[in-house]
Amino acid sequence: MSMKFTLQHKDPASKARAGELATDHGVIRTPIFMPVGTAATVKGIFHRDVRDEARAQIILANTYHLYMRPGMEIIEKAGGVHRFSTWEGPMLTDSGGFQVFSLAACRKLREEGCHFRSHIDGSKHLFTPESVVDTERTIGADIMMAFDECPPGDAPREYAAKSLALTERWLDRCFDRYHQTEPKYGHYQALFPIVQGCTYPDLRAHAAENVQQYGADGYAIGGLAVGEPTEVMYEMISAVEPYMPKDKIRYLMGVGTPGNILEGVRRGVDLFDCVMPS
C-alpha cells in the first residue's frame, strides 16, 4: 500500500508540470480536473460515462454530506466508499470544513473543533480534527484532506492570522490521529495538509513552509475562490509555489473553470476540482 507522485515533464517557459500519481486504485495522470460527486456519485451521469466520456480519473466526495447522509454505519457496512458508490478508480474526500464553515449562522468555532447544526434536521454535531480523520478513514477514499478553517476571502489580517494559527494547531492533531489509525479496507490512504492564509502573501508563504514538516504525499492550497478577485487568487498561488515540494502533487481546492485551470497549471498546480459542472 503506497502512493507516489512522479514528475515527468516541466515546461521551461512556465511552472507547468506533467506527472503521474500512483494510488492503490489506479494511476492519475496530471494535470487533471476532478469532478465533484458530493454524495460519492457525480449527479446526472453514469460512472462509466464519467470515466469514458468525461475521461475523469479521480472523483471527489464530501465528508460532511456523507456523514450526514447516508451516515458512516451504512458506508462501513458497504465496505467503504468505493463499494458503496461502485466507482472503481481513485477517490478524494474533502474534510467537510468548507461546508461546516459555510453554515455561519448554525455553527460555533472552538479550539476543540466546530459545533454545528445539520442542514437536514437541525441536529447538533461536533467536528474535531480527530473525528474528521476517523470519519475519512471510515469513508475510505485514497486521499483524505485535513480539517481546517476556511475564512472568507475578505477576512481582515488579524482574523486571517488567528484562523491560520488555529488551522495549524488542528493540522498537528489531524496528523497525530492519522498516524494512530490504520486504513479499514486494505488500501493506502494519504492525508494532505491544506495551505491557508487568505489573501496575505506572507501568511500563505508561512503556511506553505509549515506544512512541509509532515512529509505528506501531497499538498493542497485552500481558501481561494471564496470572494476575492481572480487576479488576487492567482497572486496567492504564485506566492506559495516556491515553497511547495517539487516532488509532490499540488491540489488547488474548489477552483476549476477552464480559465482558472489553465492559469493554475501555468503556476504549477496539478489537481483541480469544481462543483459547477456537476
Show the residue positions of the predicted features.
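Non-catalytic, usually N-terminal nucleic-acid engagement modules in DNA/RNA processing proteins
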Residues: 1-184
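Glycine-rich phosphate/ribose-binding loops and adjacent secondary-structure elements
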Residues: 165-168, 177, 181, 189-278
